[in-house]
UniProtKB/Swiss-Prot annotation:
Stated role: Catalyzes the last two sequential reactions in the de novo biosynthetic pathway for UDP-N-acetylglucosamine (UDP-GlcNAc). The C-terminal domain catalyzes the transfer of acetyl group from acetyl coenzyme A to glucosamine-1-phosphate (GlcN-1-P) to produce N-acetylglucosamine-1-phosphate (GlcNAc-1-P), which is converted into UDP-GlcNAc by the transfer of uridine 5-monophosphate (from uridine 5-triphosphate), a reaction catalyzed by the N-terminal domain.
Positions bound to UDP-N-acetyl-alpha-D-glucosamine: 8-11, 22, 73, 78-79, 140, 154, 169, 226, 331, 349, 364, 375
Keywords (A to Z) from UniProt: Acyltransferase, Cell shape, Cell wall biogenesis/degradation, Cytoplasm, Magnesium, Metal-binding, Multifunctional enzyme, Nucleotidyltransferase, Peptidoglycan synthesis, Repeat, Transferase
Name of protein: Bifunctional protein GlmU
């Protein structure tokens, strides 16, 4: 049977108080609307249409990789009106359509599958995803007669008895496409809000003698984000889910409450994560690594048995058995080899560092290719920028760079070379050479007495 989905993403979200469309606010590193789309796809629904409105072009830009189609709701006149705006998407289709809110990032793949299966097996015209809550204030109520679903009543339109109902509408549904399409023209805005409610389709279908079903799920999954407080709540719930998944897969989190792992991050077994670490984007961390406290790693590949202390690594790769930090900064497009050492207060930018090379402290390397088993003394600087353009430095294998050396790019240093401490290198150093580029020391005898500075 054909299955498709509509995602309602047209609202600005006034309560969240932001210039950014509400559905583009991120939870665990991913836009809420993209959480919904990705979960839909995992549940086996490939054909999805996003109803856009406020910030339409930005929403399209942030979702274009998802290969979805779009319908425009130029004026926000309710959820029913939003689905009416997708009429062209629905027209002529047969099968089942699910309707989701773009601000519900916690919905699970298993719940979506269960909703579809229940709907199809029961041959319902509509199936509502619901939850039981202690305080349903603000939510639409599921009105039943026994187990039979009669209708959904929005909170502001509830009478005294309906307000006592604690089964709430999640705003996630399955519909028979043909019956939904036919019902959209029958919607009315004769209500307190003056809006067209999608929930009224339930009563329209029921009045026509069609079956209406419901699937009850955990309230946590149905949380819609309408404020910064709810955004933080969703973040906390999803963070706990992610951390639990990694621990179940063999990763040790010393303090899960202070460990932030983005939803797309991968971590190998027997890796140990200390408190106050942040892993973002498409980061992959290998097996048997140790990440000590206060590190941030984003969009990077960390191979096996790597130790990292209090460092920042962005869009880079770190080879097996390498140590990084404390207080190192690995900037984008850097590649650190195996068994290397990047020490304290070292900055690497857009550079390749060979296997076994040691850059132990207080060094800047930018736009450089460094060979294997080199050693950098404290205070080395690759001078790669002349104020207009950045230049490249190439350093061969087994080179020794003395302390306080300036390598003025563009420059090439051959294999098995030595550079004396305090040198400023401006021209090529050939293989096997020692380069000394500093002023000769001169001692002026009796200078302190002559100047009257002796104490």
């Amino acid at each position: 049977m054909y299955k498709c989905a509509l995602v309602l993403a047209a609202g600005q979200g006034k309560r969240i108080k932001s210039d950014l469309p509400k559905v583009l606010h991120k939870v665990c590193g991913k836009e809420m609307v993209n959480h919904v789309i990705d979960t839909i796809r995992k549940a086996g629904i490939q054909d999805a249409n996003i109803i856009i409105g406020k910030g339409a072009e930005l929403v399209k830009e942030r979702t274009e990789e998802k290969k979805v189609t779009y319908s425009l709701q130029s004026e926000q006149l309710g959820t029913g009106h939003a689905v009416q705006c997708a009429s062209e998407f629905l027209k002529g289709k047969k099968g089942t359509v699910a309707v989701f809110a773009g601000d519900t990032p916690l919905i699970k793949e298993s719940t979506i599958k269960n909703l579809f299966n229940t709907h199809i097996e029961a041959k319902n015209a509509a199936t509502i995803l619901t939850a039981i809550v202690d305080d349903p204030t603000g939510y639409g109520r599921i009105i039943r007669s026994g187990n039979e679903v009669l209708k959904i009543v929005e909170h502001k339109d509830c009478n005294e008895e309906e307000l006592k109902v604690n089964e709430m509408n999640s705003a996630i549904y399955c519909f028979d496409i043909k019956l939904l399409y036919e019902s959209l023209s029958k919607l009315s805005n004769n209500n307190e809000q003056g809006e067209y409610y999608l929930t009224d389709v339930i009563e329209i279908l029921k009045s026509a003698g069609h079956n209406i079903g419901a699937v009850v799920t955990d309230f946590e999954e149905t949380i819609g984000v309408n404020s910064r407080a709810q955004l933080a709540q969703a973040e906390e719930i999803l963070k706990d889910r992610i951390n639990l998944k990694h621990m179940e897969n063999g990763v040790t989190l010393i303090d899960p409450k202070t460990t932030y792992i983005g939803i797309d991050v991968e971590i190998g077994k027997d890796t140990i994560i200390y408190p106050n670490n942040i892993f973002e984007g498409n980061t992959i961390i290998g097996e048997r690594c140790t990440i000590y406290q206060n590190s941030r790693i984003k969009d990077s590949i960390i191979k096996d048995e790597v130790d990292i202390q209090s460092s920042v690594i962005l869009d880079s790769s770190i080879g097996n058995n390498t140590t990084v930090g404390p207080f190192a900064y690995i900037r984008p497009e850097s590649k650190i080899g195996e068994k290397a050492r990047i020490g304290d207060f070292v900055e690497i930018k857009k550079s390749i560092i060979g296997d076994g090379t040691k850059v132990s402290h207080l060094t800047y390397i930018g736009d450089a290719e460094v060979g294997k088993e080199c050693n950098f003394g404290c205070g080395t600087v690759v001078v790669n920028y002349d104020g207009k353009k950045k230049y490249k430095t190439i350093i061969g294998n087994h080179s020794f760079i003395g302390c306080n050396t300036n390598l003025v790019s563009p420059v090439q240093v051959g294999d098995n070379t030595y550079i004396a401490a305090g040198s400023t290198i401006t021209s090529e150093v050939q293989e096997g050479d020692l380069a000394v580029a500093r002023a000769k020391q001169r001692n002026i005898k009796g200078w302190v007495d002559k100047k009257g500075l002796k104490k």
